[in-house]
A protein has these predicted regions:
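Rossmann-fold NAD(P)-binding glycine/threonine-rich loop
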Residues: 99-126
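A charged, well-structured terminal subsegment
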Residues: 128-134
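Active-site regions of enzymes building and remodeling cell-envelope glycoconjugates
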Residues: 58-72, 114-117
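Mid-chain, well-packed structural core segment of small domains
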Residues: 65-104
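Generic structural signal for hydrophobic
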Residues: 45, 87-88, 110
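A short helix->loop->beta-strand "cap" motif at the edges of active sites that frequently abuts
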Residues: 50, 90-95, 113-115
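Hydrophobic, well-ordered beta-alpha structural blocks that scaffold small-molecule cofactor pockets
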Residues: 1-63
Length: 134
């Protein structure tokens, strides 16, 4: 991340409605296992016409994603998620931290760098604010 981008983000906060208005999502987690929430989130986003990239089982890093990322959705063990964020050199608008993907260390890292995040659920966002909803 570039320093100026980090500073610009310090004042930016997004709510779930704004997050669901974005187009490009990077889902971090096991998106290949039908039993996992990352898979369900991936399928839900794709079904509603979002562009989705999957990091963890499909791509190894957010840096492997071609083009821009709007939203990073963390649906992965907190230690793995923190490692992915630490190595990320791409700009993004917000990180959604799914229930169970949070840790004190992750939140502290994001806060210290002024990286925008929301603790919430993209599946809820899809049902309430997804494309085709008003």
């Amino acid at each position: 991340m570039q320093e100026s981008s980090e500073q610009d983000r310090e004042t930016e906060k997004m709510d779930l409605k704004e997050i669901m208005a974005q187009r490009v999502f990077a889902v971090a987690g096991d998106t290949l296992n039908e039993e996992k929430y990352a898979y369900k989130i991936k399928q839900g986003l794709l079904a509603q016409g979002y562009t989705v990239y999957c990091v963890g089982k499909e791509l190894k890093s957010f840096n492997d994603i071609p083009g821009d990322i709007d939203i990073i959705d963390m649906c992965i063990h907190p230690a793995k998620g923190l490692a992915l964020i630490k190595e990320c050199s791409k700009d993004f608008k917000c990180i959604v931290i799914q229930p169970g993907a949070e840790s004190g260390e992750l939140l502290e890292y994001l806060d210290e760098r002024g990286l925008p995040y929301l603790q919430g659920c993209v599946l809820v966002g899809l049902s309430v604010y997804g494309r085709g909803r008003s």
